[in-house]
């Protein structure tokens, strides 16, 4: 299903790049501000979640874990005390990212280890951590009121990975809301309007009896089309941008798009 045009080395690099950009978004922001796209979190909660996830993945990769690692077994998982201030939080984020990137590089692609997914290797974690950081950086930028931008290839890969995750959830958790994304032959077309010629920027998602199928192709006859610049398209697909407004355009049956977005979840 996935394109996965990005290399393992690129993912390793992005762990520190995306963390650095996240730290920039947090610098000087009110860490007690609520995150509109994750309303149960403050900005500090988001930072601790991301930093803890980074250290958790690092521990799995570093130890070549054969089973899930509990949070309490991860050094400094919970982050520094609040009273230590934003400088300590920033340093903790930076150190965790550097350690995770180093562990991934040392492991190399395809190294066998536990994951919660269909792919039991370091390659899964390199990609998953990159996209975890990218999307939560968007959350942080929205909360801090600063601009968010993403490389088009990285944003397209975020869409690809999300589709893989939703398909996996359908297979292993059939009672999950994602299980309702099947049947009827309805189609959802995603169209990045700023994609360069030959670049990956279109997805045709078709509901089938077994779930859904994805093809990288254009159509003018989809049940609904979501279109816009690649970054905004990705954010809307991840429910980080509203479907109203000027950022993206919906053509066709909006209710089907909303049906998809409400059920394309996991966790």
Regions found by a protein language model. Give the residues of each.
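Short, contiguous alpha-helical
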Residues: 30-72, 116-173, 233
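A glycine-rich beta-turn/hairpin centered on an aromatic-Pro dipeptide
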Residues: 162-205
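C-terminal interaction segments
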Residues: 219-267
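Active-site-proximal cofactor/substrate-binding loop regions of enzyme domains
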Residues: 10-82, 87-92, 96, 100
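N-terminal export signals and maturation junctions of secreted/periplasmic proteins
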Residues: 1-13
